[in-house]
């Protein structure tokens, strides 16, 4: 029996990032990686957001996040906006706090209808915090390239942790490189012991960046909120962009503000409800049968 048997789910998207939200606050039984993969086989998604019973006072829930390959993610900005949208629909509160593997995340109703703001916390830059497999004193750019040594296709990325590892390659044209080909190679590069999200980014102006992301554990995605935060921060660290920027992703726009007062990164964007349904227990029974076989 799975904790997801007959459970109600909401299919949503955060500017194109495919999200499934399940409220399990009345269900302490764990959801397994096999369960997460079984859902993905039936209902394709980028992230599965599971609301589990709160573990800390003042929080609404512990949010466990699965990628579609069954691996866990510490943070998912687009997914958290979807969770916030669902929760705000049943409360008059202006702000909500959730616990994730990456720490506490605060969410607010945004500056306009349909927009939500998530405090993604403070970025980390130390090589052990990202983490990297070897020491780099300056993570604004590290020695990593793909392609010929004398003419690399991609090289010297910036690396940042937003509760999950990110590598950002600065390019003139984000469509000129086959991210579907290079993404998995870079995600699984030995320099990243926990794998990494891989982003191609182009700085249009000091307040505007375009980007595409190969998401760790999910693949090519139309949007990755934590990658947008990491990219904005990395550009500001290089002094090539301001601390408040508009990010253009294949799925839409995000506003990112790297606050000077506490170094927290605030992400504002939309969240769309698509439909709801219930999981068929047979879905998870088939998964268990395959595993036991």
UniProtKB/Swiss-Prot annotation:
Domain of life: Bacteria
Subcellular location: Cytoplasm
UniProt site (Could be important to modulate the pK values of the two catalytic cysteine residues): 166, 215
Biological or metabolic pathway of the protein: Amino-acid biosynthesis; L-lysine biosynthesis via DAP pathway; DL-2,6-diaminopimelate from LL-2,6-diaminopimelate: step 1/1
Pfam families membership: DAP_epimerase
Keywords attached to this entry: Amino-acid biosynthesis, Cytoplasm, Isomerase, Lysine biosynthesis
Reaction(s) this enzyme catalyzes, per UniProt: (2S,6S)-2,6-diaminopimelate = meso-2,6-diaminopimelate
Residue positions binding substrate: 17, 47, 67, 77-78, 164, 197, 215-216, 225-226
Its EC number(s): 5.1.1.7
Keyword Ion transport found: no
Active-site annotation: 76 (proton donor), 224 (proton acceptor)
Gene Ontology terms: biological process: lysine biosynthetic process via diaminopimelate
Single Gene Ontology MF annotation: diaminopimelate epimerase activity
GO cellular component, one term: cytosol
Subunit and partners: Homodimer.
Family statement drawn from the similarity comment of this UniProt entry: Belongs to the diaminopimelate epimerase family.
Task of the protein: Catalyzes the stereoinversion of LL-2,6-diaminopimelate (L,L-DAP) to meso-diaminopimelate (meso-DAP), a precursor of L-lysine and an essential component of the bacterial peptidoglycan.
Record HAMAP family: DAP_epimerase
Entry protein name: Diaminopimelate epimerase
């Amino acid at each position: 029996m799975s904790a997801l048997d007959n459970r109600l789910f909401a299919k949503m998207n955060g500017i194109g990032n495919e999200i499934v939200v399940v409220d399990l606050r009345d269900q302490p039984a764990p959801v397994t990686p096999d369960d997460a993969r079984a859902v993905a086989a039936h209902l394709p998604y980028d992230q599965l957001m599971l609301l589990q019973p709160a573990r800390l006072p003042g929080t609404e829930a512990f949010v466990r996040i699965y990628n579609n390959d069954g691996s866990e993610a510490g943070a998912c900005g687009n997914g958290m906006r979807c969770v916030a949208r669902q929760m705000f629909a049943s409360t008059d509160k202006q702000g909500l706090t959730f616990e994730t593997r990456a720490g506490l995340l605060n969410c607010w109703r945004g500056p306009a209808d349909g927009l939500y703001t998530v405090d993604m916390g403070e970025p980390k830059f130390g090589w052990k915090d990202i983490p990297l497999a070897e020491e780099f004193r300056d993570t604004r750019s590290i020695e990593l390239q793909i392609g010929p040594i004398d003419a690399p296709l991609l090289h010297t990325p910036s690396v940042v942790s937003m509760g999950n590892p990110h590598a950002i390659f600065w390019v003139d044209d984000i469509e000129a490189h086959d991210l579907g080909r290079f993404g998995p190679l870079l995600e699984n590069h030995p320099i990243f012991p926990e794998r990494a999200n891989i982003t191609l980014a182009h700085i249009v102006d000091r307040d505007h960046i375009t980007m595409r992301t190969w998401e760790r554990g999910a693949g090519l995605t139309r949007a990755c909120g934590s990658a947008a935060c990491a990219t904005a921060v990395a550009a500001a660290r290089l002094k090539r962009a301001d601390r408040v920027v508009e990010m253009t992703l294949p799925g839409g726009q995000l506003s990112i503000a790297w606050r000077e007062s506490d170094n927290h990164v605030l992400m504002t964007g939309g969240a769309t409800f698509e439909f709801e349904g219930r999981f068929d227990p047979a879905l998870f029974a088939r998964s268990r049968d395959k595993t036991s076989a």
